[in-house]
Amino acid sequence: MNECIFNIDPKLLSLASEAENECREMFEKIDSNAEYNGQKVLKAFIDNRVSEGCLKGTTGYGYGDMGRDTIDKVFAQALGGEDALVRHTFVNGTHALSTALFGVLRSGDTMLACTGKPYDTLEEIIGIRGEKGSGSLIDFGVKYEQVDLVDELCPDYDEIAKKAVGAKIAYIQRSRGYSLRPSLTVEIIGKIAETAKKANPDIIVMVDNCYGEFVERKEPLSVGADIIIGSLIKNPGGGIASTGGYICGRADLVEKCADRLTCVGMGKEVGCSLNQNREMLLGFFLAPQMVASALKTSVFACRFFEKLGYKTLPESGETRTDIIASILLENEENLVAFCQGIQKGSPVDSYVTPEAWDMPGYDSKVIMAAGAFTMGASIELSADAPIRPPFAAWLQGGITYPTGKAGVMLAAQEMYNKGLLRI
């Protein structure tokens, strides 16, 4: 480890150096995937003739927005879809997911959640939580069924096959959300898709791809998914895109989603890009390398805190399929100190002390450490957690590995300063 200019205890520095050396093999795999995915993105830029004109925006209706339409093509090729809908008007990943669900589902259709209960923020959209009559899927006559994971770990393929019969959508959440189940590899997503389609050839496999883009060499569309959804302030925005989301997959499904986002009959043909095209293109171009930095930060953090005596999910030596790591910190005091330490290692608002609050869409208080250039950007180093057992911090991001590593060490130092670590 190179010289550290922060006031980190020598014992912590020694442990961090050991942890980093033990991560070298994982780092090599991450770099190899980043090189492959970087070439894949570059080829999409070249094949779709991205020009300087594509970097400019439009106003008003946005008719003939060359940059907007080219971005759709670049995303579609790189992610393996027929078409894509990439828009800065998606306010977050949940909005993009909601648009896709409402775009594809109709009254009387059944949504089958194949990986247990989805994110907290989707519960009210579906209608399994919140007030009746608020405009949820269930309010509009959509039925909801759920297949829980076996022992909260593995998909229940037999139950998926049974319930897929008659369902319109097989919904898969790639990342773990605020749970401790493993995130799903692209291979496992493919097995779920195969199982659902064998039971019901007409079923639409929809994947919440948030936090997973460019972690592996393949994306879910290459293994049987029909449509994937994500956020531009996570992986594919590369730390540059300031807002937005995407929907990518089968052209007919993307068009339905576009009609939902704008209006029926206009779809993708309208929607000005303002000055967002350059940020979205540059961010997507950089995304594979930014994801690699976030993955290295995650692997290092897990190994470092394992050496400090904490359990991590995934463990430091396990193959990644998203950028999230869970560090089980055992109690509220440890959890809050960790998040406050991450904040102290942030480039923006490092002097701010995060506290738990009642965050919209969640049923318990949440603490968030996110001193980011883009508010809520999960590709930048951040940590958040609901204040409830098992008091796990969900760590993600780090657009440069050296600063991500420093942030993790400062989190440990904050715990040490408060007498919460024994070294």
What residues fall within each predicted segment?
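Conserved C-terminal alpha-helix-loop-beta "cap" of PLP-dependent enzymes
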Residues: E306-R422
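Short beta-strand to alpha-helix junction loop
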Residues: Y63-G67
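Conserved PLP-enzyme active-site core in the AAT-like
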Residues: C4-R24, D31, V41-C54, G62, ...
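Solvent-exposed, charged/polar functional surfaces in cytosolic regulatory/catalytic domains
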Residues: V74
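Short glycine-rich or small-residue beta-strand-to-loop segments that form or flank ligand, phosphate
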Residues: C54, T58-T59, L85-T89, I323-L328
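Interfaces and regulatory segments of ATP-dependent nucleotide/adenylate/phosphodiester-chemistry enzymes
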Residues: M1
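Acidic, PIN/NYN-like endoribonuclease modules and their adjacent C-terminal/linker elements
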Residues: A34-G38
